Amino acid sequence: MAMIEVKNITKTFGDLTVLNDFSVDFEQSGVTVLLGPSGTGKSTLLRCINGLETVDKGDILVDGLSVNNKKNLKQIRTTCGMVFQQTVIFPHLNVIDNLTLSPMKILGMKKAEAEDLALHYLEKVGLADRGHSRHNELSGGQQQRIAIARALMMNPKALLLDEVTSALDPEMTREVLNILESLAAEGVCMLSVTHEMAFAKGVASRIIFMEKGKVVCDVPKDEFFGSVRNENERINQFLSFIGE
């Protein structure tokens, strides 16, 4: 059984159908990059997996638990940590307190254990000296790295990454991509919506290209950037448009 099973889901916003009878499975391994033009349902798919959006039809199972049952959402959100395009760091808390809040409240972790774990992940993302900093003392890249550390604090089986570098300048983008590349090398499972082709080419094991709420192709990375691009005019057009 796949870790995440998306079963024939449809999601609409008013008259707009964003995901149309959409199905896909994700195993607990590798890095899957979701590509496609804006508005084709990539971010909506991640939000549906995490239970932040409800589906109109179909179902999503995360470790066998249905997102349609609200009682499962706490466990599902622990299983799938999500990092957003716009970082949400509580401004009234320092970095350590931002990282320890959920493990203490949701997992029942003791304060000392949570703080030790927070220091471990801050070191992993290269911010060991920022534990007592607050929101306004951090750059955008630092905030995103802290958001990644906060997601890892819950020991998720997968990270859902929703265009986490799109609001950053090139230098900050590289800071964040370095962390994601390091996590991928450690075997952390990731589902990423991104337009960073360097990340897709360097780290992804699987590429899913979406358009009009459906899967156009679902192939290994090397095949996507090789034979699929050469043979599929639409995908070649998309990659050329974004400068790849």
Can you annotate each of these PLM segments?
Residues 50:
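Helix-to-loop junction immediately C-terminal to a conserved catalytic motif
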Residues 67-81, 111, 226-228:
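ABC ATPase NBD coupling module
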Residues 133, 154, 186:
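Conserved signature/switch motifs of ABC ATPase nucleotide-binding domains
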Residues 134-138, 142:
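Conserved ABC ATPase signature
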Residues 159-162:
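Catalytic Walker B motif of ABC-type/P-loop ATPase nucleotide-binding domains
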Residues 216, 221-222, 226-244:
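C-terminal boundary and immediately downstream tail of ABC-type ATPase nucleotide-binding domains
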